[in-house]
Amino acid sequence: VYPIKIIYAGGIYLNRWKTLIHIAKAIKEINNEGIKFTLDIYTNNVVNKKILKKLNDNTNCFFHKAIPFEQLKKEYLKSDIALHVESFDVKNRLSVRMSFSTKIIDCLDSGCAVMAVCDKKQGGFAYLKKEDAAICIETPKKIKWMLERIYSNPSIINDYKKKALECGIRNHKKNDICKELKMDFERIAYKNDYFTD
């Protein structure tokens, strides 16, 4: 069912907004002869009018204030692709290279296919690529090409919905993480008790 709905939820600082503009531009070009994709952005961040104009044309792209997580989950259910993005500029690329955004876990758990658009050396991108849990785009030049590929072969979305869900269950199940954390804390507490006696 068209249009294919893409959703981004999170901060757009550290020049993530620039990556979102690349995506918005590609969508606008593809939608030239009819709406094939839409992009919804949910964020607490405020942007200037020039940026807002590029991210909120009310046809291809829609810019919204952040919403509570329970409401966001409903928006994910209405969407096809959840985005994870980082900036491509050198300074910001280096500042997030070793980080792993908790938003990745939200994306994997969203019920959507996940699309990562960032430098291939970024920690989250490398993880998603290794796990084959996301549609991975490592340069802005490939965004339009990938979206056209998805439009002509929408089964890619269902394949990556399944892969994202499987990765989330395999590696990020909340109960398992809580158990592991509890065990870690108990080990630390035990060691501290042992050494203080």
Give the predicted meaning of each segment:
Residues 6, 19-23, 39, 143, ...:
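A structural motif in glycosyltransferase catalytic domains
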Residues 108:
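Short alpha-helix at the nucleotide-sugar/activated-sugar donor binding site of glycosyltransferases
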Residues 125, 148-166, 191:
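Conserved donor-nucleotide binding/catalytic region of nucleotide-linked donor-dependent transferases
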